[in-house]
């Protein structure tokens, strides 16, 4: 879904943890132990509004709020990432005033201007997908939310403008794009390779743009890059059927290694294989076939159970005939991927394994002091830190990085588990995670990343609020408790929307 975060970052400053949690409507609702799903959905909506109000007051039109110092940051080129990332969530929540404010902002963005390096991947999954999703929703099931059709049409116009700014990244000998580009000089960072997820997480958004505009160029560019991932060369780069290496040579499309994982940097390549089939099963059956191979190989070769907790299931990584017994919060989308694939393909074995993965990721949440899972962990009995031996014996893992940067993947998979099985326990887990995040990360203007989920109050607060708080954490928390709708994930082959890796619902192709 996105690359792992290492601390400290230049955009984050470590601050004390003695910030009082403001008691707004959400806090009152939480203290009253809401019983109904509607009350819980309303609590999530209030939390979204709390963060939105803080962003508008202190940071708009910049990319992010700094939720401790009440300032702003521009880690995504200064085009207002939080606003664009919030659009689809605001539509789903029916917040017309927020939606209109974002639409007016989008109309004014000049995507040809930035002084910073542009990430093709991040810009695609946040900005391009955010606008395409808003367009699909407002042209479809939410068509009565906004009156100004010109503003809605502007979403598609700006999507095309942005893609036209970015498309030179694909101008390489192979068609495998550069990720880090300079849109002013049409230069790049000189990289010789691109990552698996970065290369393989463009095809949904760029194909959708072609389908909406009738211009095949965008789909062809992204599908050309993807073609090298579907037919990996050399053969050694595919150590198990469907599971491929992590780096691709930009010059010739050949894989540069054979390191296999579902962790950050590799993750969303596998995520999009099955999602492209959901988007259009006629055009993308090959993608589905590759996902099935990868899923079957993952169960056979990467499934791992901690010795101290054999009831838990995590995914290991594989390289040079060695297994790495470690995982990440980013990886926890995996349960949702298996559940989606299982229900779409009517494969109960995939559903069952997806639920095993969901259980494992839930254990990383319920084992910590804050009831939020860490950014990374391991279960190699030979590498247990001396000060975590007791924790490892009880929890089944040891914490490698205890930070929490407002990531959504665990809640995301809880949501898929509830939608596919209908079991209330998974919706309860969404609520538990939301309550923990609201309690631990909330500030007077928004929500902050924290340094250690296994310390009181999450340790120290980082002065950063990623845009995906709006796009993903709030959306999945809300969807789990809201009424059925066209944009909800459905059992079987009934999905009319498919979610990109930033949780933006894209309308499936209509043949």
Curated annotation (Swiss-Prot):
It catalyses: N(4)-(alpha-D-Man-(1->2)-alpha-D-Man-(1->2)-alpha-D-Man-(1->3)-[alpha-D-Man-(1->2)-alpha-D-Man-(1->3)-[alpha-D-Man-(1->2)-alpha-D-Man-(1->6)]-alpha-D-Man-(1->6)]-beta-D-Man-(1->4)-beta-D-GlcNAc-(1->4)-beta-D-GlcNAc)-L-asparaginyl-[protein] (N-glucan mannose isomer 9A1,2,3B1,2,3) + 4 H2O = N(4)-(alpha-D-Man-(1->3)-[alpha-D-Man-(1->3)-[alpha-D-Man-(1->6)]-alpha-D-Man-(1->6)]-beta-D-Man-(1->4)-beta-D-GlcNAc-(1->4)-beta-D-GlcNAc)-L-asparaginyl-[protein] (N-glucan mannose isomer 5A1,2) + 4 beta-D-mannose; N(4)-(alpha-D-Man-(1->2)-alpha-D-Man-(1->2)-alpha-D-Man-(1->3)-[alpha-D-Man-(1->3)-[alpha-D-Man-(1->2)-alpha-D-Man-(1->6)]-alpha-D-Man-(1->6)]-beta-D-Man-(1->4)-beta-D-GlcNAc-(1->4)-beta-D-GlcNAc)-L-asparaginyl-[protein] (N-glucan mannose isomer 8A1,2,3B1,3) + 3 H2O = N(4)-(alpha-D-Man-(1->3)-[alpha-D-Man-(1->3)-[alpha-D-Man-(1->6)]-alpha-D-Man-(1->6)]-beta-D-Man-(1->4)-beta-D-GlcNAc-(1->4)-beta-D-GlcNAc)-L-asparaginyl-[protein] (N-glucan mannose isomer 5A1,2) + 3 beta-D-mannose. It holds the Pfam family Glyco_hydro_47. The enzyme is inactivated by reaction of carbodiimide reagents with Asp-375. Since the antibiotic 1-deoxymannojirimycin (DMM) acts as a competitive inhibitor, and it blocks the reaction with carbodiimides, Asp-375 is established as an active site. High activity in presence of EDTA. It is found in: Secreted. Glycans are attached at residues 182, 366, 438. Keywords: Disulfide bond, Glycoprotein, Glycosidase, Hydrolase, Metal-binding, Secreted, Signal. Ca(2+) binds at residue 501. Disulfide bonds join 332-361. It is an enzyme of class 3 (hydrolase). This is Mannosyl-oligosaccharide alpha-1,2-mannosidase. It comes from the Eukaryota. Its EC number is 3.2.1.113. The keyword Secreted applies. It comes from Penicillium citrinum.
């Amino acid at each position: 879904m996105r690359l792992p975060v290492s601390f400290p970052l230049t955009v984050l400053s470590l601050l004390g943890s003695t910030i009082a949690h403001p008691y707004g409507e959400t806090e009152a609702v939480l203290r009253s132990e809401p019983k109904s799903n509607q009350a819980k959905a309303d609590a999530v909506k209030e939390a979204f509004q709390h963060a939105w109000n803080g962003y508008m007051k202190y940071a708009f039109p910049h990319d992010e709020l700094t939720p401790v110092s009440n300032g702003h940051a521009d880690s995504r080129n200064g085009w207002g990432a939080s606003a664009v990332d919030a659009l689809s969530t605001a539509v789903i929540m029916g917040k017309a005033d927020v939606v209109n404010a974002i639409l007016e902002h989008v109309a004014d963005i000049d995507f040809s201007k930035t002084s910073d390096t542009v990430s093709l991947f991040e810009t695609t999954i946040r900005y391009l997908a955010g606008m395409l999703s808003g367009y699909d929703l407002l042209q479809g099931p939410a068509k009565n939310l906004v009156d100004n059709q010109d503003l809605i049409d502007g979403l598609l116009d700006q999507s095309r403008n942005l893609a036209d700014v970015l498309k030179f990244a694909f101008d390489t000998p192979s068609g495998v794009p550069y990720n880090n580009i300079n849109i002013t000089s049409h230069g790049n960072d000189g990289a010789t390779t691109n990552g698996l997820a970065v290369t393989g997480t463009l095809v949904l958004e760029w194909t959708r743009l072609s389908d909406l505009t009738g211009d095949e160029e965008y789909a062809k560019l992204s599908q050309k890059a993807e073609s090298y991932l579907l037919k990996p060369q050399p053969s050694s780069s595919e150590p198990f059927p469907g599971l491929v290496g992590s780096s691709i040579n930009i010059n010739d499309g050949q894989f540069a290694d054979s390191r296999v994982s579902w962790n950050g940097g590799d993750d969303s390549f596998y995520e999009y294989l099955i999602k492209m089939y959901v988007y259009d099963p006629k055009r993308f059956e090959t993608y589905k076939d590759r996902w099935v191979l990868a899923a079957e190989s993952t169960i056979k070769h990467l499934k791992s159970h901690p010795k101290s907790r054999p009831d838990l299931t995590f995914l290991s990584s594989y390289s040079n005939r060695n297994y790495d017994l470690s995982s990440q919060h980013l990886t926890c989308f995996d349960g949702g991927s298996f559940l989606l694939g299982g229900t779409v393909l009517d494969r109960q074995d995939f559903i069952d394994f997806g639920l095993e993965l969901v259980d494992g990721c839930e254990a990383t949440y319920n084992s910590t002091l804050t009831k939020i899972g860490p950014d990374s962990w391991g279960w190699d009995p030979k590498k247990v830190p001396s000060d975590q031996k007791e924790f490892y014996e009880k929890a089944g893992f040891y914490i490698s990085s205890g930070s929490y940067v407002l990531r959504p993947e665990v809640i995301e998979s809880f949501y898929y588990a509830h939608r596919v099985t209908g079991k209330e326990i998974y919706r309860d887990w969404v609520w538990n995670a939301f309550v923990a995040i609201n309690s631990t990360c909330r500030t007077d203007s928004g929500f902050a990343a924290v340094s250690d989920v296994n310390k009181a109050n999450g340790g120290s607060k980082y002065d950063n609020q990623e845009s995906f708080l709006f796009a993903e954490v709030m959306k999945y928390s809300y969807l789990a408790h809201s009424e059925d709708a066209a944009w909800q994930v459905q059992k079987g082959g009934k999905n009319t929307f498919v979610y990109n890796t930033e949780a933006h619902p894209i309308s499936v192709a209509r043949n």
